[in-house]
Amino acid sequence: MTAQRETVVLVHGLYVHGLWMYLLECWLEQSGYRTVNFSYPSMTRTPGQNAADLQALLEHQDTPVVHFLAHSMGGLVVRHLFHDHPKQRPGRVVTLGTPHQGSYAARIMH
């Protein structure tokens, strides 16, 4: 039986596409992780709506450990995920430049 690799879910930020995380995805895979690059419509749906889509994606992943690496608004999507769907597999969450205290862009969008 082959040991399953830990999974890192990459969640991009506002105004960009999942391809923006491609170099990180390649580096993580070369480092032995399995990756899932979650691309979502950051301008037309709320972080909560995108978190629901992320949860649906996670339900189809066969992996024992899930880590999250999120940039900017992607970190808010992950926060909504854990708030709305608290039962998650073990793993770590890393957010980069996430406006946890709010931002001007968030105020004018919603």
Feature-to-residue mapping (PLM):
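Proline/glycine-enriched tight loop/beta-turn segments at coil->beta junctions
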Residues: T2-T7
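Serine-dependent carboxylesterase/thioesterase catalytic core
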Residues: V8-L19, L23, W27-H110
